[in-house]
Amino acid sequence: MIRKKASPHCLHDVSGSCPHLSILLHSSRRPESAPVPCLLPMEAKIPLLTPHTMGRFHLAHRVVHAPLTRSRCYNNLPQEHVQLYYSQRATNGGLLIAEATGVSETAQGYPNTPGIWTKEQVEAWRTVVDAVHQKGGVFFCQIWHVGRASTNDYQPNGQTPIPCTDKKITPTVLKDGTVEEFSAPRRLREDEIPQIVDDFRIAARNCIEAGFDGVEIHCAFGYLIEQFMKDGVNDRTDKYGGSIANRCRFALEVIQAAIDEIGSDRVGVRLSPYSNCLDCWDSDPDALGLYMIQAMSKLGVLYCSMVEPEVVKVDGKVQIPYKLWHFRKVFAGTFIVAGGYNREEGNRAVSQGYTDLVAYGKWFLANPDLPRRFELNAPLNKYDRSTFYTSDPVIGYTDYPFLSPL
């Protein structure tokens, strides 16, 4: 059996209508598996809850909602349940990054993921953005193109997916025995690449038109931009292949196009140099990451969100590799880390100056009031991995419980 699953990238750090929207905004169904929150004594303000100025944005705390694909945007449109999901997690002065959003028809590769290349999509996102802004949140939209991580079924007119290479992603046997397999791709011609760059530029403009405060360009987890960046995939012999400078050329052209369109103070970038997701790896991730960080600093990129190498547990405790120091020291803008962080490790990372902000995925999807739970040192709801990528507009999406009012 061949099965397509939703994007694994967004939950690494861990990215119809709702008839009862007004009710659900204030009360959510408690999953049977979720613990009843029991508040512990408050303590002095923790590092994660101290303010931070990110360019023009004055953030009240450092707990960031990571971009998380959830496969619930039917027909590539965010609907009322999506509005509810983000508004539940919005806080005054808190930064949320919306799920990976396609820049064009050819950008799609997974079921029920949103886009922002049409007027209808822009208007649909506007209602979501308005709901977040009404609660004082700062809202960025992650924009992407999946490249070879697609099948002909998701491409316009059944055409072949278009990455930097003709190499196909190796089929993967999933835990349930099914197989994840992508279609054989067609290498982009050099003369086609400017159109993809322009798609990102237009998407950035559309995000601002929809009301977003900025965009995060997805240069991570094995999707199109990273496919160009990493030598484990990029086998081109033109100006977009070979040296690090050539392999990063496409990424920097996209970033520059977005900056030219909406300003560097509204552009963030996500990188995962150590990841090998989707057969996308590099022989020298340190050099690759450093090259990108230095170039992004020169361009005045607002923030860089970087993903830790694989996190392990020792005696039940999360062990963060802390391998991003050299990138943090070089980057001139706001630095965001992600990848396995909990409350304790997040506080440690901020207090030691390792990062400015910490992005949370799985814990934020399961705890809509995560900053408050961190403040009170309250127990966290357990996330249900089986509902990460299902299409239900409520279960595993908007029904995770809040803490009881004090």
UniProtKB/Swiss-Prot annotation:
InterPro entries: Aldolase_TIM, OxRdtase_FMN_N, Oye-like. Substrate binds at residues 218-221. Its EC number is 1.3.1.-. Its cofactor is FMN. GO terms for molecular function: FMN binding; oxidoreductase activity. Disulfide bonds: none annotated. GO terms for biological process: fatty acid biosynthetic process; oxylipin biosynthetic process. FMN binds at residues 67-69, 100, 142, 270, 340, 361-362. Keywords: Fatty acid biosynthesis, Fatty acid metabolism, Flavoprotein, FMN, Lipid biosynthesis, Lipid metabolism, NADP, Oxidoreductase, Oxylipin biosynthesis. It is an enzyme of class 1 (oxidoreductase). The active site is at 223 (proton donor). It comes from the Eukaryota. Putative oxophytodienoate reductase that may be involved in the biosynthesis or metabolism of oxylipin signaling molecules. Belongs to the NADH:flavin oxidoreductase/NADH oxidase family. This is Putative 12-oxophytodienoate reductase 8. It comes from Oryza sativa subsp. japonica (Rice).
